[in-house]
Amino acid sequence: MTQTEKHALWAQEEQSAEMHGWDFSHIRGRVVEAPLPWDYKQKVLDFLKPQSVILDMGTGGGEFLLSLRHPFSQTSVTESWQPNFELCEKKLAPLGITVRKTEEDKPLPFADNSFDLVLNRHDSYDVNEVRRVLKPGGYFITQQVGGSNNLRLRALLGNNKTAMPSFNLENELLHFKNAGFTVNFCDQALSLIHI
């Protein structure tokens, strides 16, 4: 199969895939990712207490959040992508979870010192806004995709440009430390994806 034929096939696949939240079940069994050296869910569970008031930033459709089985009345989510926001309003709000829409470069729509724990898996964030909404002694747990991730995949798709080349662990650590955070754990992995 030529590169042009592959691109056409991938474009067709993209059009046929129905996305609801961050449910990627349509590619299950067709993509192999190297495991990460940490377990994000376990990291969250290590800090999540029954009385914790939590925020899940960029929750998608709440798939991960719901797997935590945390009391809904102590849970808030944000979502910026309109289809996912609408899904959250239909799926999460009726459960009693607070759902808020966010916009890039705007303050988080919550009062200062609102949360014991802020979660963020692959969503953008402003370190100072996270600090503002955390209660004193609160925790921010994040897992991000850095600017150097998937370079081979980008090249395969014909896009060799990195959108955010300076977004990496080293630079983000400086931002967190400058904002007054204490970093309890950090690691990075540049994993390979096989399609």
Region roles according to the model:
Residues V31-V53, E63-F64:
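Conserved alpha-helix/loop element of class I SAM-dependent methyltransferases that forms part
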Residues P165-G180:
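Short alpha-helix
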